[in-house]
Amino acid sequence: MEKPLFPLVPLHWFGFGYTALVVSGGIVGYVKTGRAPSLAAGLLFGSLAGVGAYQLYQDPRNVWDFLAATSVTFVGIMGMRSYYYGKFMPVGLIAGASLLMAAKVGVRMLMTSD
C-alpha cells in the first residue's frame, strides 16, 4: 500500500485550532473595543466548536455536530459583519477561517455518508 504524499491531519486538530482562533478573537475584540458582546460571542461559539472538536476526537465518524453547525453559523454572522463594516480584520479573518472549517467539515461529511 502506498503512503500518501502528504500525511492527513485529523479533522479534530483543525477543530481545536479553530476553537482557539474563535475564543482569542472574542477576547481580542473585547480588549480592543471594550464591548462585552464580542467576548460573549467568542466564548459561546468557541465553546460550541470545542465541544464539536472533542466529539469528533472521540468518534471520527461523528461530523454532524457542534463543529459543523458552529462554523456554518459563524460564516454567516461574521461574513455579514465584514461586509457591513468593509474591513477584513478581525471579522473577515474569522469569517474566512469559518468558511474553511465549514468546507473541511462538509468534505468530511460527503466522504463519510453512512
Swiss-Prot record:
Membrane-protein topology: Multi-pass membrane protein
Statement: the UniProt record of this protein carries the keyword GTP-binding: no
CC annotations in GO: mitochondrial membrane
Stretches of the chain forming a coiled coil according to its record: none
Origin organism lineage: Eukaryota, Metazoa, Chordata, Craniata, Vertebrata
Protein name: Transmembrane protein 14DP
Pfam families found in the cross-reference section: Tmemb_14
Protein encoded by which gene: TMEM14DP
Location in or out of the cell: Membrane
Family: Belongs to the TMEM14 family.
Keywords from the named record: Membrane, Transmembrane, Transmembrane helix
Transmembrane segments: 8-28, 36-56, 63-80, 83-103
